[in-house]
Design a protein with these regions (language model features):
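N-terminal domain-start motif of subtilase-like serine proteases
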Residues: 186-214, 238-241, 358-362, 446
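C-terminal subdomain of the subtilisin-like protease fold in secreted/lumenal serine endopeptidases
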Residues: 11, 302-309, 321, 418-460
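Bacterial N-terminal signal peptides
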Residues: 19-28
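Autoinhibitory propeptides
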Residues: 121-190
Length: 460
C-alpha cells in the first residue's frame, strides 16, 4: 500500500510539473508575440521609422546625424554639381544624397533618401519647420530661409545671422516679441520691391517702357507669376524639353518689367528659355536671330530693342565666334544686348542700406563682388523679386550678383528707347556712364539724369 501511495504522489508531482512547464512555455510565446522581446531592426526599418518620426528630415538631417543612427557607411562618394557639393552615402538597401553650397561653410544636409529603390517622403514639398536654434546653422546665405518656418524659435539673439539670410513671403516668423529689435521682415520684403534711385518717379511721368519690347534669354520660366504675367508677349523654349521651372528667370523678369519691382513695368516681354547649363552659345545666337525676324514682321507691335542675358560665360563656351557675329548683327538692327560679360560695358552691384531712402544714391553700399574703377553701379542686393516657387511668392534677396544687375540696366535701356526710339545702342552705354553720380562707393547710375540726357539727344 505504501508503494502505491508513493507512486501516486510521484505521478501527481509529474503532472503538476508538466503543467507548470506548459504554462511557462505559453507565457513565453505570448510575451514574444506581443513584441515585448527586443529584436534587432534592419537599417531599412530604422530609416523608415526615423522618417515617420521626423528624426530624418529634408535639409535638417546631416551626414553625422545619419551615421549616428545607422553606423558606418558601406560606401560614400563626393562630387560637384554646379555650385553644390553632393555627398552620396550607401547602406544595405539604402541610398542617401546630401548637398551643400560650396561657397559657404554650412554643413551638408539631406536632399533625398531611398530604401530598396523606393524614394521616401522626407518633406521636399512641405515647409521646413525648424526644431531648435541649432537648425539655423544648417542654412546658407544663398537659399536662406525661403519657405522655412521659424515660428517655434526665439530669434532675439540672432540679428547678425538674419541680416545675411534671404527669405520669402512663405517664411513663417515668430511673434514680434521673439524677433530682434528693429527687425521687421514684412517691411523689408515690401520696401525691397522699390527699384530705387528715382525709378518710380519716372513711372509717374509716363516713362515706364510702354511700346518697347525687351527679350530675356534665360532658363525655363514660371510664366504665370503675378509680377510679370500680363507683360509676357511671347514665350519660346529652345532645347529645354522636359526641364521644370528654374529659379533664375522670375527674379530677372521682375527686375526688368515687374509691375511693382521692375524698372520698365509697361514694356512687352519676350522670353526665350534656353539650357544655360550647357557650355554652348548657339541657343543665344538662335534666339537673337529669331528676335531680328520678329522685328521685321509688320505684325509685331512692340519691337524688341533690348536683350538681357544674365550670364557672362560666352568666351568659355562653344561657338564663341558665332556669338560675336550675333552681337554685331543685333547692334546693326538697333538692339542693345546686356549681359554679365564685362568686355564692352563695365558695371557692378550695389546693396541697399535697409531703412534708408532708396532714391538717394548715398543709401547704398558696394556689393559683395569687386569691380574695376569707373564701373557703373546699380542696385542688386537687399531687393525683392518674384520667386519661382509660386505665382504670388516673392523673395527678399540679401547679396546679389551680376545676374540681378543686368536686367536693371536692360530696363533702363528700355526707358531710353521709349523716350528716343532712334537712339543708338552705343549711345545708351555712353550716357549711362556720363550721367552716373559719384558717391563714396563709386559711380552710381542716375536714372533721371540718364533719361534727360537721352531726351537731349533726340532734340539734337
Amino acid at each position: 500500500m505504501r508503494f502505491f501511495s508513493l507512486y501516486n504522489a510521484l505521478k501527481m508531482q509529474i503532472r503538476i510539473t508538466t503543467a507548470l512547464i506548459l504554462i511557462l512555455c505559453f507565457s513565453i510565446i505570448a510575451f514574444c508575440t506581443e513584441g515585448n522581446v527586443p529584436t534587432k531592426s534592419s537599417p531599412a526599418d530604422i530609416v523608415r521609422q526615423a522618417v515617420a518620426d521626423g528624426k530624418i528630415a529634408y535639409k535638417l538631417t546631416t551626414p553625422d546625424e545619419l551615421k549616428a543612427l545607422l553606423g558606418p557607411v558601406e560606401n560614400q562618394t563626393l562630387r560637384n554639381s554646379g555650385g553644390m557639393e553632393i555627398l552620396e552615402l550607401k547602406y544595405p538597401d539604402i541610398q542617401v544624397i546630401f548637398g551643400r553650397m560650396r561657397d559657404y561653410s554650412t554643413p551638408s544636409t539631406l536632399l533625398w533618401i531611398a530604401v530598396k529603390d523606393k524614394q521616401l517622403d522626407i518633406g521636399q514639398e512641405r515647409q521646413i519647420v525648424l526644431r531648435n536654434e541649432d537648425d539655423l546653422k544648417k542654412f546658407d546665405p544663398f537659399w536662406g530661409l525661403a519657405n522655412v518656418s521659424l515660428a517655434n524659435l526665439d530669434l532675439r539673439g540672432h540679428l547678425q545671422l538674419l541680416q545675411t539670410m534671404p527669405f520669402d513671403s512663405q517664411t513663417k516668423w515668430p511673434g514680434p516679441d521673439k524677433l530682434p529689435d528693429g527687425f521687421d521682415p514684412v517691411k523689408l520684403l515690401e520696401d525691397g520691391k522699390n527699384p530705387g534711385l528715382g525709378i518710380r518717379a519716372l513711372h509717374k511721368q509716363g516713362v515706364d517702357g510702354r511700346g518697347v519690347g525687351i527679350a530675356i534669354i534665360d532658363q525655363p520660366l514660371l510664366k504665370d507669376h503675378i509680377e510679370y504675367a500680363d507683360r509676357l508677349t511671347r514665350y519660346e523654349a529652345i532645347d529645354v524639353d522636359g526641364v521644370p521651372v528654374q529659379m533664375h528667370g522670375p527674379p530677372i523678369c521682375s527686375i526688368a518689367v515687374g509691375k511693382t519691382c521692375g524698372v520698365a513695368p509697361s514694356a512687352s516681354l519676350y522670353y526665350f528659355a534656353v539650357p544655360m547649363w550647357k557650355p554652348d552659345n548657339m541657343p543665344y545666337c538662335d534666339a537673337i536671330d529669331k528676335l531680328i525676324q520678329l522685328n521685321a514682321d509688320p505684325n509685331t507691335t512692340a519691337r524688341v530693342r533690348v536683350v538681357s542675358i544674365s550670364t557672362g560665360m560666352f568666351p568659355q563656351q562653344a561657338n564663341f565666334d558665332r556669338w560675336k557675329d550675333a552681337l554685331k548683327k543685333a547692334e546693326e538692327n538697333g538692339i542693345l544686348v546686356v549681359t554679365c560679360a564685362q568686355d564692352s560695358f563695365q558695371y557692378g552691384m550695389l546693396a541697399r542700406n535697409n531703412g534708408k531712402d532708396p532714391d538717394d544714391p548715398a543709401s547704398y553700399r558696394s556689393g559683395i563682388y569687386g569691380v574695376g574703377p569707373g564701373a557703373v553701379l546699380v542696385p542688386a542686393g537687399n531687393r525683392t523679386t518674384a520667386s519661382h516657387t509660386g505665382r504670388d511668392v516673392y523673395t527678399f534677396w540679401r547679396e546679389a550678383g551680376m545676374s540681378w544687375a543686368a536686367p536693371y540696366l536692360a530696363g533702363l535701356a528700355v526707358l531710353a528707347y521709349q523716350v528716343n526710339p532712334e537712339i543708338e545702342p552705343k549711345t545708351i552705354i555712353t550716357l549711362l556712364q556720363k550721367t552716373a553720380v559719384k558717391t563714396s562707393v563709386g559711380d552710381v547710375v542716375q536714372p533721371a539724369d540718364f533719361i534727360k540726357a537721352v531726351r537731349d539727344t533726340k532734340h539734337k
